Amino acid sequence: MSEPFKSGFVAIVGRPNVGKSTLLNHIIGQKIAIMSDKAQTTRNKVQGVYTTDESQIIFIDTPGIHKPKHKLGDFMVKIALNTFQEVDLIYFVIDASTGFGRGDEFIIEKLKNVQTPVFLLINKIDLIAPEDLFKLIEQYRDLMEFDEIIPISALQGNNVPNLLEQTNANLEIGPMYYPKDQITDHPERFIISELIREQVLQLTREEVPHSVAVVIEGIEKNPKTEKLTINATIIVERSTQKGIIIGKQGQMLKQIGMRARKEIERLLGSKVFLEVWVKVQKNWRDKEHYLQDYGFDREEY
């Protein structure tokens, strides 16, 4: 007799840049959470769905937890903390190469207040010596009792199969929430805007990134050629930022558009014509109605 089907929700939490999105993308096998080396890259809960014949795991990739500096920051931390209560299991990801960080203490204090089981995932183990890894494990073990401590490399996939095995062991019998071939519950529009924002983050200087939102104004399919026309607007807070994103003779914007278009074509499997504009909206991160316009819905969280 076959084993009953299991399912559950797993939150991936940790300081900014510890590799949460890389891990999610490695497990799902397709790029659904935006990745960049800049802090606070992930803004909304991106759900990745991993389905096998035995189980379905729904992953929630939360923003990096940090001390908020503005309303958008408040919003991002609130999402992450609320998530702890809603899920069946929490992955707390740390970066082995940087060791214990100030933000980890903040997260551990929050984790101590929830009943949800917590796995400590020590990521980037390929970057440190084995003896340093053992010291790190002991250090975190003294701070909190974790249900499992699993060293991994999200980028290379080291020990990820073992992680998924341990995760399955912690799941309850449950339904298949999503169709077998579905890997995320976010609409295509959201993922397209995230892919454009990823290129802005990767290509522009430090002052621009966190002041950027991307709004998809329209997506149209040409019935004859099957080609998609996507109109997108990059929203920034200052005209100097607009200048940086457009670049000399429009070169930076051209680069952003070209790289984003390739990623979008890979995602959708069809040819894309991408038109990108840049618009200044002063202090949008502190204005609630703008936050809602750009996809940050307070009610949803």
Swiss-Prot record:
Tell me, what is an example of a GO biological process annotation in this record? ribosomal small subunit assembly
Chain spans, region G4: 123-126
The region called G1 is annotated at 14-21
Q: Kindly list the positions annotated as binding GTP.
A: 14-21, 61-65, 123-126
List residues of the Era-type G domain: 6-173
- Positions of the region G5? 152-154
Localization (cell): Cytoplasm; Cell membrane
Q: Which Gene3D superfamilies match?
A: 3.30.300.20, P-loop containing nucleotide triphosphate hydrolases
Coarsely, its chief localization is cytoplasm
**Region labeled G3 — which residues?**
61-64
For this UniProt record, the keywords arranged alphabetically read as follows: Cell membrane, Cytoplasm, GTP-binding, Membrane, Nucleotide-binding, Ribosome biogenesis, RNA-binding, rRNA-binding
Q: Where is this region: G2?
A: 40-44
Coiled coil regions, renumbered to chain: none
A single Gene Ontology CC annotation of this entry is:
cytosol
Outline the extent of the KH type-2 domain. Answer: 204-282
- Domain of life where this protein originates: Bacteria
> Could you give a GO molecular-function term held by this entry?
ribosomal small subunit binding
What topology does it adopt in the membrane?
Peripheral membrane protein
Assembly information from the UniProt record: Monomer.
Protein function: An essential GTPase that binds both GDP and GTP, with rapid nucleotide exchange. Plays a role in 16S rRNA processing and 30S ribosomal subunit biogenesis and possibly also in cell cycle regulation and energy metabolism.
Family the entry assigns: Belongs to the TRAFAC class TrmE-Era-EngA-EngB-Septin-like GTPase superfamily. Era GTPase family.
What is this protein's record name? GTPase Era
Q: What is the lineage of its organism?
A: Bacteria, Bacillati, Bacillota, Bacilli, Bacillales
* Originating gene: era
